[in-house]
Amino acid sequence: MKTRLVKHPCPEATIAGAAARVPAAIIAAVLLGITASPARADCNPAERINASCYSNLQDATTAAIAANQPLWLPAGTYVLNRELVIDYAPLAATGFQIISDGAIIDATATGNRAMSIECSGGSPQDAKGCFYFHIQGTLFVNANSAQAAVRFGFNDFSDAHNSAKIDHLIVNNAGPGYAVRLNYNLNADIFAVAVSAGSAGLVMDQVQFSRISGAASATRGTAMRIERGYSFANTIQAIDLEVAQIGLAITSPYANRNTFVSPYFNCPTAILATAGNSNMLLNPSYGAGQPPAPGSQTGVLTLP
């Protein structure tokens, strides 16, 4: 996973070159083979791990989790050669934070998923409870994959992510897969722009009492899907669903009492709901196609 950055390069100093800039104690530590602090202050910021000071993003992530410190992504492009796995199980009780200054994670060349946020150690019968994952700032993620570009939680629901917060996540999957897939997220607050050239932009699989906003599109598919597991008591607000054949599809029989506040649909087919109960659209707007006829969509109520 090679990192290519626009800013904050790390020094590659020899011991002789370092002598002019660092104390003798650090030089002695280097000569003794002991790991010393980097000479540049921006490669050793207080209380955070600077990803630009590592040869690859996976190593930086592992170091941040081990140190129980936020992972800082300075502005720049981080090119992956394999999937970035963020397994914050060691911090399941207190959470893990990523601070992004408009960084771009680019997995386009791999053909695989770009990023998986997970919490190992559970099972489908006994999911591991994990808390307080947070992406602060704006983070861009690019992929070209048949998988979801960003997956939050294992597909088998073996990790339950509680009280996550994602400030501003922009995901673009140029392949046939999903852009963003949410698996077993509870009491989350997520703003995502989920764009796919393929089957679905934003997919909610077992999401409960969470707040979701942003935008979703899928050129050859469905902008937003609620399709597996128990998804209920969610508020989806100020969301833009467009550039897709279908705006919203609800196929899970356990999708109940979700409220869409002022959603905007700009797709040939705005809504296709075949399952669920008491899912409400409050004050929806339609930019293309016709609003669904009253009573034509299973479990969907519209006001006004």
Positions of predicted regions on the chain:
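Right-handed parallel beta-helix/beta-solenoid
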Residues: 38-59, 77, 304
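All-beta strand scaffolds that present successive hydrophobic residues in beta-strands
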Residues: 73, 93, 97-100, 132-136, ...
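Glycine-rich beta-solenoid repeat tracts in large extracellular/virion proteins
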Residues: 61, 83-89, 112-131, 147-159, ...
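Bacterial N-terminal signal peptides
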Residues: 21-35
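Residue-level detector of bioactive/disordered segments in secreted/extracellular proteins
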Residues: 12, 44-45, 55, 121, ...
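N-terminal extracellular ligand-recognition/capping segment immediately after the signal peptide
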Residues: 54-58, 62, 67-97, 101-111, ...
